[in-house]
Amino acid sequence: METFLFTSESVNEGHPDKLCDQISDAVLDACLQQDPDSKVACETCTKTNMVMVFGEITTKANVDYEKIVRDTCREIGFVSDDVGLDADNCKVLVNIEQQSPDIAQGVHGHLTKRPEEIGAGDQGHMFGYATDETPELMPLSHVLATKLGARLTEVRKNGTCPWLRPDGKTQVTVEYHNDGGARVPIRVHTVLISTQHDETVTNDEIAADLKEHVIKPVIPEKYLDEKTIFHLNPSGRFVIGGPHGDAGLTGRKIIIDTYGGWGAHGGGAFSGKDPTKVDRSGAYIVRQAAKSIVANGLARRCIVQVSYAIGVPEPLSVFVDTYGTGKIPDREILKIVKENFDFRPGMISINLDLKRGGNGRFLKTAAYGHFGRDDPDFTWEVVKPLKWEKTQA
């Protein structure tokens, strides 16, 4: 049997880039909670002892940006300079302006347009992907890397591994078999974890704890064998981390946010953007489309692309490819997608309830992936029953 290796990585919530994603989405949540029509484009950057939020926000909401920054950093675990950032004593800089009136009139006619008339907030193309290799209909390499990162945070916060610090990265290589275009995982080839730690712990203790408390509970036994390679803190030392170790910036982990290198990516980031930004809403609706195609048995694996022009409601193009796994021709599936999904930005917002912020709704998306999550707030993960003539099959 011919096999191949494919690798996906993840970072956990204490990684500086992910810290920035979470702050940007916490700001979005705060704006949408008070004013669902908020227009938000919020970027964050961080380096030693400093966090800056900047961008364009037009909202009726009364938002305390500094408090959101400090609360988000504290919740992640950045509570002292030792761990990489002190939430209560770091410098917080804010440079927020209103959305450009040129963009505003082109996209939503200064709020005079009906939902179906609202134009895309920018040009761009987005991809949605789904595969039947996991219950989440997500790639296994990505699912495992993401879950390892989430588990690292869990055992840090619940005290199981008190030597852990917030920053950390994971990477998983899976050996796959190509089954007529579908992807069948055979085994896990390599597991890599690099996690920030305190000064007291030894490398042997780190390796033992990571195997017992992180890898064992996450990776199903059937995928591990005596040949599986483990790289556990291979650099030997990772005490300095968070923004002290590396600068961070919103939108730098777009593959981790999506499909771990599978499918394709149009390049647009998600965090800190309200649903008129098709980088986000467009990517969410094509994930729902791709997932629904696979879940309804139309294909085992699928990618959907949509593209937009600024100020224009209707998409410029929609594309479907089932990698040869479709039960009916791709052109028929494309027809079904167009009949069952409304790709106009204003309608995506309504159908996926994307104007509802607050309660950490979008903050939750900003760590451990936007897709494949079992959470009612992730409305784009709901499978749509597709209307199609079974006689076509």
UniProtKB/Swiss-Prot annotation:
Family to which this protein belongs: Belongs to the AdoMet synthase family.
Gene Ontology CC: one annotated term: cytosol
GO biological process: one-carbon metabolic process; S-adenosylmethionine biosynthetic process
Cofactor: Mn(2+); Mg(2+); Co(2+); K(+)
Disulfide bonds: none
Residues where K(+) binds: 43
Role summary: Catalyzes the formation of S-adenosylmethionine from methionine and ATP. The reaction comprises two steps that are both catalyzed by the same enzyme: formation of S-adenosylmethionine (AdoMet) and triphosphate, and subsequent hydrolysis of the triphosphate.
Amino-acid positions noted as binding Mg(2+) in the UniProt annotation, renumbered to this chain: 9
Reaction it catalyzes: L-methionine + ATP + H2O = S-adenosyl-L-methionine + phosphate + diphosphate
Keyword annotations from UniProtKB, A to Z: ATP-binding, Cobalt, Cytoplasm, Magnesium, Metal-binding, Nucleotide-binding, One-carbon metabolism, Potassium, Transferase
EC number, as in UniProt: 2.5.1.6
Subunit structure: Homotetramer.
Molecular function terms from GO: ATP binding; metal ion binding; methionine adenosyltransferase activity
Binding positions (ATP): 15, 167-169, 235-238, 246, 252-253, 269, 273, 277
Name this protein carries in UniProt: S-adenosylmethionine synthase 2
Pfam families named in the record: S-AdoMet_synt_C (PF02773), S-AdoMet_synt_M (PF02772), S-AdoMet_synt_N (PF00438)
Organism (species): Vitis vinifera (Grape)
Coiled-coil zones: none
Entry binding sites for L-methionine: 56, 99, 246, 277
Cofactor binding: number and manner: Binds 2 divalent ions per subunit. The metal ions interact primarily with the substrate. Can utilize magnesium, manganese or cobalt (in vitro).
InterPro entries reported in the protein's UniProt record: ADOMET_SYNTHASE_CS (IPR022631), S-AdoMet_synt_C (IPR022630), S-AdoMet_synt_central (IPR022629), S-AdoMet_synt_N (IPR022628), S-AdoMet_synthetase (IPR002133), S-AdoMet_synthetase_sfam (IPR022636)
Annotated metabolic or biological route of this protein: Amino-acid biosynthesis; S-adenosyl-L-methionine biosynthesis; S-adenosyl-L-methionine from L-methionine: step 1/1
Subcellular location field: Cytoplasm
